[in-house]
């Protein structure tokens, strides 16, 4: 079975638009990007197009590539203080001279729609998340949509970043899965994968996972974004793995669209929370 993230994201975006229109709220998202990295610029454009589609207002702030940490923090502070802005997203990676951790921690937790602030990550680990990072949360939505219940299953997460690996593991634990996190120091990755019912790969190695490394009843979620011979591909060798497993996400058209749909959901959630606080 092919898990169609594009289809599910379209469905979610339509639902979000309806909910926003019925709410009477006008959520607003601010994106901050430093430099002219083509991939980052493309991702930001996609996010703003999604905002327009679901009736979320958005502004884009582009800073020079040689911006200092202080300059980025100044921008964040201004957005934190702006009551018209409900969500703040800093497009990563930031230029080498900018302290990414300091920038993330400067965003107000209630406007941290990316879910990277230590406060929000802590709540996620505690089992009561306010905002979870968009890619892992989007994956959980995909699993739910396809009636794949992680409870009691063995899940292997490859990667330990704060944007995918670590929060993905936490969400799966919260869903009662038995979770193993693998990474560059894991001694026998294939052995771990063969035992897994659910595999989430965010390792960044093109077509690394092959059919002989997975079991026949596995669900494989490919978060990898790699370019080979000018074409986009994931961490999974789709040709060999898709013939064997129970379900798999393609690249493109799998996880990527869900990340953006989840960002819209988080932004609307932020607007609702801030509206309630204003009213009361």
Swiss-Prot record:
Pfam families: THF_DHG_CYH, THF_DHG_CYH_C. Pathway: One-carbon metabolism; tetrahydrofolate interconversion. It catalyses: (6R)-5,10-methylene-5,6,7,8-tetrahydrofolate + NADP(+) = (6R)-5,10-methenyltetrahydrofolate + NADPH; (6R)-5,10-methenyltetrahydrofolate + H2O = (6R)-10-formyltetrahydrofolate + H(+). Catalyzes the oxidation of 5,10-methylenetetrahydrofolate to 5,10-methenyltetrahydrofolate and then the hydrolysis of 5,10-methenyltetrahydrofolate to 10-formyltetrahydrofolate. HAMAP family: THF_DHG_CYH. NCBIfam families: PRK14178.1. This is Bifunctional protein FolD.
């Amino acid at each position: 079975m092919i898990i169609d993230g594009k289809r599910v994201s379209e469905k979610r975006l339509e639902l979000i638009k309806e909910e926003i229109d019925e709410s009477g709220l006008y959520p607003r998202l601010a994106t901050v990007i430093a430099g002219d990295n083509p991939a980052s610029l493309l991702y930001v454009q996609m996010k703003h197009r999604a905002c327009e589609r679901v009736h979320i207002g958005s502004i884009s702030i582009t800073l020079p590539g040689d911006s200092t940490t202080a300059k980025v923090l100044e921008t964040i502070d201004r957005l934190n203080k702006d009551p018209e802005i409900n969500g703040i997203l800093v497009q990563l990676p930031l230029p080498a001279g900018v302290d990414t951790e300091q920038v993330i921690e400067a965003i107000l937790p209630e406007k941290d729609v990316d879910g990277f602030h230590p406060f929000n990550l802590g709540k996620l680990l505690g089992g009561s998340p306010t905002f979870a990072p968009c890619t892992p949360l989007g994956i959980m939505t995909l699993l739910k949509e396809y009636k794949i219940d992680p409870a009691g299953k063995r899940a292997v997460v490859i990667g330990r970043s704060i944007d995918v690996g670590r929060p993905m593991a936490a969400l799966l634990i919260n869903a009662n899965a038995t979770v193993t996190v693998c990474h560059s120091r894991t001694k026998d990755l294939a052995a771990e994968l063969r035992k897994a019912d659910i595999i989430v790969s965010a390792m960044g190695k093109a077509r690394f996972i092959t059919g002989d490394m997975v079991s026949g009843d596995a669900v494989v979620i490919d978060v990898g974004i790699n370019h080979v011979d000018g074409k986009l591909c994931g961490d999974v060798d789709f040709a060999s793995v898709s013939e064997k497993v129970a379900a798999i996400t393609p690249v493109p058209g799998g996880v990527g669209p869900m990340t953006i749909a989840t960002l819209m959901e988080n932004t609307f959630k932020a607007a609702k929370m801030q509206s309630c606080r204003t009213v009361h």
